[in-house]
Amino acid sequence: MGSQPKRAAQEGAFETALSLLHRRGRIDALGTGGPELDGLIGGLEPGLFYLFYGSEDGGLPDELLLRLLVEAAARGRAVYLVCGNYRRSRTVLDSERLLSLIDGAGLDPDDALSRIHVVCAFSERHLIRAPDLVEEVLGRVDGVALVAVQQLAKLFHGRLALRREDPSEFTGVVSRLRELCFERGVVLAASCRPSGRGRPAPEPEGGSFLRHAANVIVYLRASRRGGTVSAYLVKHPDSARSGRMVSFSEEGWAWGG
């Protein structure tokens, strides 16, 4: 995959607005598989950090990560970091759903799965070490288009968090993952839960640093009556996009059937 952000940094400390516009116009963004969501965020640009959050019970953010894994496997490779203490929070890799999406995309299951490299973090200490494992994969294989992190904030935040490590370690994990992906021109996409309530969207779990670190933040919510999914764009580098919302049917959301 290309590494546009890294090359731009190497060419000089400054870049004109015109050259930036031309460069972004050539970027091969990763699609979500859903036209409404792609239209809202403009696809996922290499080197940027995307945070998708919503109710974990509804499963929308984690479902989206699975879709992104399939999109990445169709063009190259992906790293999937699964976070959560299984005994306390039942965080799992939904392999059946992933296979369903792969089949729906018309990909060969064995080939697609061989392109997805899984890293698991079952404790805060595991998560602190996870960036080293991700870096190892990025250095060992070519063509990684995506690093997806399921429930990034779960081990350090929330009522079931054990809190055995300094909270500042979480900041280090996010910074390291962001830096690794930016330098290599790889999309970083993470899911997390909302923290409390708020309108038009609650804050994402993970504290103020996570909100500032993410380049794009999207809140996903299913309608109370069912049948519809709403995506609210909380943050985007293009400020004109921020605050927009799209809705689409759950049938359209369930890529791959």
Feature map (PLM): residue ranges:
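Short, surface-exposed amphipathic charged segments that create phosphate/polyanion-binding patches used
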Residues: 9, 127-137, 231-237
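Phosphate-binding/switch region of NTP-binding enzymes
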Residues: 178-257
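P-loop NTPase motor core
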Residues: 132-212
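The Walker A/P-loop phosphate-binding site
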Residues: 2-108
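Helical mechanochemical/support elements of P-loop NTPase systems and associated helical scaffolds
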Residues: 33, 61, 94, 123-127, ...
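Conserved inter-motif catalytic segment of the P-loop NTP-binding fold
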Residues: 80-161
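Short, well-ordered alpha-helix to beta-strand connector turns
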Residues: 47, 76, 113-116, 213-215
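Hydrophobic/aromatic beta-strand patches that form the interior of the parallel beta-sheet core
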Residues: 50-52, 80-82, 117-119, 189, ...
